[in-house]
């Protein structure tokens, strides 16, 4: 059950959900994708992938009929909002179905960091323990398995929110090493800087605005260099920033991120807030393009910061200085580039990650009753006294029905 139609060429989230569905298909499982979202411009052709699809309605009993007739063994929710909307209907009509929550990233963490950034201070516990957090954690507890994309978020859920790790499963981006390019363009065949990201995603828009401040420092030392900014759905406020005179270029949507990434010498990702792990930085590793990023940008993506294929810094002037240095120094660039392959192979191998996920699903499915008995808090949250979202949905459905009479 998707939040939006998958757009693997527009967002890392779209790419991630497609890799999970392809994994399910490889097990000879029948996969259907449904969403209440309207058709989008860059959505993938699911039929071509061997995945059936249908549109569903929010707050409508038509979903009950649909899910009852389909009678799935497994239901995966794409982000916690979909579990809030449809989880109780799945529970009522298919109580035995294994419920998986694909968190994509912890929205509550991203929201808490954004609040702190706006007020120019460190994130506090009060920021983190918001109403949004309570909703997201409740959704995690109501599901049988929640997929967590970042090792940092795994630790946060276990240590801070005291969630039993038996209902969590670590699943970063999955990279098919057999399709991993054996060779990429060398240093002297690459030029310019680049960044990429869906403009509708708030942390990506913040990156563009922050790069506006950093770019003059870089351009001063490298007057012929350009910064190419790619991403889907650029709004007028973004295209208005396009400035050929200063080399600050808003390029917009691109069919293949890897093609433009491989032509660039460096990927710049000064990410100041967000959560999960960053698709642009994984793409940089795949194309063996060194990157300059922040602590939050690299968070959960490697175990040792010394092994980062580039530089990690939170200081604006240091960011610019390192970008200039790495852009000019071929030996240093090659040294950092070597870390790309090592990181991909040690953390993001789709064969290993896929095998572990299928193993977890089958294990829980075979022991579903005992697994649920161990999750008393989740059972309590599903109890009728706490299902406010269910009754709100039923009220809206009844109200809509009366409108149509």
Placement of each model-derived feature along the sequence:
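N-terminal subdomain of nucleotide-sugar transferases
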Residues: 1-43
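Acceptor-binding helix/loop patch of EC 2.4 sugar-transfer enzymes
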Residues: 3-7, 96-97, 101-130
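Conserved catalytic-core segment of nucleotide-activated headgroup transferases in glycan assembly
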Residues: 18, 33, 159, 169-262
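Acidic donor-binding loop of glycosyltransferase active sites
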Residues: 72, 144, 262-276, 287-289
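Donor nucleotide-sugar binding/catalytic pocket of nucleotide-sugar-dependent glycosyltransferases
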Residues: 141-159, 163-180
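Short hydrophobic beta-strand element within catalytic cores of glycosyltransferases
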Residues: 280-283, 290-294
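Conserved acidic donor-binding segment of nucleotide-sugar-dependent glycosyltransferases
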Residues: 309-317, 325-330
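C-terminal amphipathic helix plus adjacent low-complexity
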Residues: 339-405
């Amino acid at each position: 059950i998707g939040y939006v139609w998958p757009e693997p060429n527009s967002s890392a989230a779209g790419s991630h959900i497609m890799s999970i569905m392809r994994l399910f298909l490889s097990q000879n499982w029948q996969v259907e994708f449904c969403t209440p979202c309207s058709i989008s411009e860059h959505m993938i052709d699911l039929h071509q992938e061997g995945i059936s699809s249908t549109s569903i309605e929010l707050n409508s009993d038509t979903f009950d009929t649909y899910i009852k007739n389909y009678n799935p063994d497994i239901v995966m929710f794409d982000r916690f909002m979909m579990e809030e909307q449809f989880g109780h209907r799945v529970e009522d009509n298919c109580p035995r179905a294994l419920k998986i929550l694909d968190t994509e990233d912890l929205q509550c963490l991203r929201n808490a960091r954004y609040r702190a950034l706006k007020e120019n201070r460190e994130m506090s516990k009060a920021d983190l323990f918001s109403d949004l957090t309570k909703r997201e954690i409740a959704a995690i507890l109501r599901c049988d398995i929640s997929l967590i994309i970042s090792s940092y978020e795994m630790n946060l859920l276990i240590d801070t929110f005291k969630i039993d790790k038996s209902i969590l499963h670590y699943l970063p981006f999955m990279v098919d090493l057999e399709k991993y390019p054996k060779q990429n363009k060398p240093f002297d065949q690459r030029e310019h800087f680049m960044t990429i990201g869906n403009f509708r995603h708030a942390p990506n828009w913040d990156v563009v605005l922050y790069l506006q401040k950093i770019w003059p420092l870089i351009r001063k030392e490298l007057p012929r260099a350009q910064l190419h900014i790619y991403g889907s759905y650029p709004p007028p406020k973004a295209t208005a920033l396009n400035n050929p005179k200063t080399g600050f270029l808003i390029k917009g949507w691109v069919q293949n991120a890897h093609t433009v990434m491989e032509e660039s010498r460096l990927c710049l990702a000064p990410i100041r807030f967000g959560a999960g792990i960053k698709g642009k930085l994984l793409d940089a590793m795949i194309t063996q393009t060194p990157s300059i990023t922040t602590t939050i940008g690299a968070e959960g993506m490697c175990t040792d910061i010394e092994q980062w294929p580039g530089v990690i810094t939170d200081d604006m002037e240091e960011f610019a200085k390192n970008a200039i240095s790495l852009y000019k120094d071929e030996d240093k660039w090659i040294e950092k580039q070597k870390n790309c392959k090592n990181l991909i192979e040690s953390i993001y191998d789709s064969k290993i990650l896929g095998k572990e996920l299928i193993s977890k699903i089958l294990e829980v499915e075979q022991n579903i009753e005992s697994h649920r008995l161990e999750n008393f808090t989740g059972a309590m949250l599903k109890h009728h006294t706490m299902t406010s979202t269910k009754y709100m949905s039923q009220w809206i459905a009844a109200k809509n029905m009366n409108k149509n009479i």
